[in-house]
């Protein structure tokens, strides 16, 4: 799409790279992604927002831009969500038009005509940009080369949002903690702390050392040996809040665990959390009912 004069430029000379791009490409246009962030949560469509800062490049430093269309797609179907006009862009630090786009999960599924029963965790909502120029040309993800989607331009024109299932309240079910210790001498004080409606329980691999007797006494029943095993937690119907937290004891680098979830009737088995390099703090589970 863009023609460049052959030149050697250091990867660290970002300003020179920008100057070269602006001065030497002869044709075409791109949308450069400056930054992007956001998640789509099945349980919170209104507050699940994808945002990105984008920058438009053309031979007239933005003068050729007619508009930028934002499409959303799901399972092969696509709908136009929004059209950005040049007036919605401001001049960025490189002298080129920049703007911030936001696409909420709620707006995406509304534009696509989807109900919650038609999508679930692991499904993908696609967001696609189309740059239209005043000379009649258009550029999008279906007509850009690999050199444009990576490197300096970071111009994919498309973003895939995987739907996550992050609970906003307690999810009734059976939680199985599959725990392991690489050294084979228990977790020595490390544990998973779970609080449900203000009641706290602790899960871990008991240590074989007498000095850890008091810490072992805090743990819920465990089935296994010093190298690994399981423990279970049942969260009943009607529970309001739940939180999962990792607290480190001695040698936490030896510890790893997964949390498997099933509904109270044993159906819907799935991995809600997996951590092989443990880190202290609250853990966010993904549970798709």
Residue ranges, per PLM feature:
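C-terminal motif of bacterial Sec signal peptides marking the signal peptidase cleavage site
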Residues: 6-10
């Amino acid at each position: 799409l863009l023609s460049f004069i052959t030149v050697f430029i250091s990867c660290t000379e970002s300003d020179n790279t920008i100057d070269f791009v602006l001065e030497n490409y002869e044709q075409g246009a791109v949308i450069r992604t400056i930054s992007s962030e956001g998640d789509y949560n099945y349980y919170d469509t209104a507050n699940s927002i994808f945002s990105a800062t984008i920058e438009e490049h053309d031979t007239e430093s933005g003068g050729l831009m007619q508009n930028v269309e934002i499409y959303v797609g799901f399972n092969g179907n696509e709908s136009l969500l929004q059209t950005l006009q040049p007036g919605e862009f401001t001049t960025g630090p490189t002298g080129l038009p920049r703007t911030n786009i936001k696409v909420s999960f709620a707006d995406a599924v509304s534009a696509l005509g989807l109900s919650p029963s038609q999508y679930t965790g692991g499904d993908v909502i696609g967001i696609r940009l189309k740059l239209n120029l005043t000379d009649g040309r258009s550029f999008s993800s279906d007509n850009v080369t690999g050199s444009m989607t990576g490197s300096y331009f970071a111009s994919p024109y498309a973003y895939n949002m995987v739907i996550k299932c992050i609970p906003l309240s307690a999810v009734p079910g059976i939680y199985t903690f599959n725990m392991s210790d690489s050294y084979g001498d228990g977790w020595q004080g490390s544990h998973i702390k779970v609080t449900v409606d203000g009641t706290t329980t602790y899960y871990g691999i008991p240590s074989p050392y007498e000095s850890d007797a008091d810490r072992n006494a805090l743990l819920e029943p465990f089935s296994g040996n010093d190298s690994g095993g399981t423990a279970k937690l049942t969260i009943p119907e009607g529970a309001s809040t739940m939180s999962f937290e990792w607290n480190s004891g001695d040698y936490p680098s030896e510890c790893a665990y997964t949390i498997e979830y099933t509904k109270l009737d044993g159906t819907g088995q799935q991995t809600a959390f997996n951590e092989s390099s443990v880190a202290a703090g609250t853990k966010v589970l993904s549970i798709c009912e």
